């Protein structure tokens, strides 16, 4: 029989918002476990743009998704959270007021007083390009995210798409690849104007081959690409050499089992009280991109703010008889002791 894990708070999602929630809850002596469907912490930052620069974290002019994840992991070390990776929450059962029994697809069972949903936008899956047989190359020479730039050094790369991701990786990978082709169905790009301008400069200097059209066929064997056929606008055909393809057709968001937890939903998002970030179910909170409220901004810094306010309400469920006095880490010797800096 599976042993039940008892914890004060269970956090669903180990992205930046979920990790920072551990910090805010830890300051209040609240023990946490985290569950994430991915095989690593960091959420979208680690999975989709680990080496992409982030410029809007307060006080940090630039940091990568990987760097931010590492910094947050270092920040929460004093609170020693337990993290369960490669697991997805399958069921949530209310067994107290409030108390929940939560079961994962791996059979892990938790009992917690508070449940925090920090699952980003749910489960993100990249959209496949409409090219016959592309799945045979996925994971080996067709990649939907860049996890290590060095893997593309010296390669003949084809990037497909016209949005920010396609343009960003065109600019970032161009200096290290052997050759690069950018394919988009029209000569009109949705990315940031500055990125479009830089891309066109690469084309003008001969460092980037821009093809306006669509890939219709891939060549290769045993999962390794060797070339691609492009039907250009005007119906002429171009053949290119490539050993790596990066399609950026956007992501499909799937809310997954969260939709079956009895939470009020609004366009696949969870409405919350903006003073506490509690959902319509007492004891269940939602922070980060998964929630919605008037004026919502899908920014990491917004999720940090939401986590801080959530913790102030969560502590009342965990310690209902305890008088909690708000303290500052700059002046509280109690908090500094918890952080190991005093």
Curated annotation (Swiss-Prot):
FAD binds at residues 17, 36, 44, 49, 89, 124, 289, 330. Binds 1 FAD per subunit. InterPro entries: FAD/NAD-bd_sf, FAD/NAD-binding_dom, Fd--NADP_Rdtase_type_2, Ferredoxin-NADP_redctase_2. The keyword Flavoprotein applies. It comes from the Bacteria. Its EC number is 1.18.1.2. It is an enzyme of class 1 (oxidoreductase). The keyword Oxidoreductase applies. It catalyses: 2 reduced [2Fe-2S]-[ferredoxin] + NADP(+) + H(+) = 2 oxidized [2Fe-2S]-[ferredoxin] + NADPH. Its cofactor is FAD. GO terms for molecular function: ferredoxin-NADP+ reductase activity; flavin adenine dinucleotide binding; NADP binding. Keywords: FAD, Flavoprotein, NADP, Oxidoreductase. PANTHER family: THIOREDOXIN REDUCTASE 1-RELATED-RELATED (PTHR48105). Belongs to the ferredoxin--NADP reductase type 2 family. Homodimer. This is Ferredoxin--NADP reductase. The lineage of its organism: Bacteria, Pseudomonadati, Pseudomonadota, Alphaproteobacteria, Hyphomicrobiales.
């Amino acid at each position: 029989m599976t042993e039940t894990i008892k914890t004060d708070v269970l956090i669903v999602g180990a992205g930046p918002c979920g990790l920072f929630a551990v910090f805010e809850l830890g300051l209040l002596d609240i023990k946490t476990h985290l569950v994430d469907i991915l095989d690593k912490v960091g959420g979208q930052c680690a999975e989709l743009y680990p080496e992409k620069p982030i410029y809007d974290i307060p006080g940090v002019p630039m940091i990568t998704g990987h760097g931010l994840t590492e910094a947050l992991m270092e920040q929460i070390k004093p609170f020693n959270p337990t993290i369960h990776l490669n697991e997805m929450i399958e069921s949530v059962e209310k067994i107290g007021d409030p108390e929940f029994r939560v079961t994962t697809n791996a059979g892990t069972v938790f009992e917690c007083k508070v449940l925090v949903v920090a699952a980003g936008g749910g489960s993100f899956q990249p959209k496949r390009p409409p090219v016959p047989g592309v799945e045979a190359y996925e994971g080996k020479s067709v990649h939907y995210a860049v996890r290590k730039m060095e893997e593309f050094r010296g390669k003949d790369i084809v990037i497909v798409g016209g949005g920010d991701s396609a343009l960003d990786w065109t600019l970032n990978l161009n200096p290290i690849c052997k050759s690069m082709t950018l394919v988009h169905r029209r000569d009109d790009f949705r990315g940031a104007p500055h990125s479009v301008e830089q891309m066109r400069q690469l084309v003008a200097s001969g460092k980037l081959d821009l093809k306006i059209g669509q890939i219709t066929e891939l060549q290769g064997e045993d999962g390794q690409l060797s070339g691609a056929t492009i039907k250009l606008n005007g119906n002429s055909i171009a053949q290119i050499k490539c050993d790596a393809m990066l399609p950026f057709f956007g992501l499909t968001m799937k809310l997954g089992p969260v939709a079956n937890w009895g939470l009020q939903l609004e366009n696949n998002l969870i409405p919350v009280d903006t003073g506490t970030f509690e959902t319509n179910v007492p004891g269940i909170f939602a922070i980060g991109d998964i929630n919605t409220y008037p004026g919502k901004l899908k920014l990491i810094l917004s999720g940090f703010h939401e986590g801080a306010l959530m913790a102030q309400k969560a502590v009342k469920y965990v310690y209902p008889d305890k008088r909690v006095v708000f303290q500052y880490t700059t002046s509280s010797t109690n908090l500094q002791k918890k952080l190991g800096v005093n």
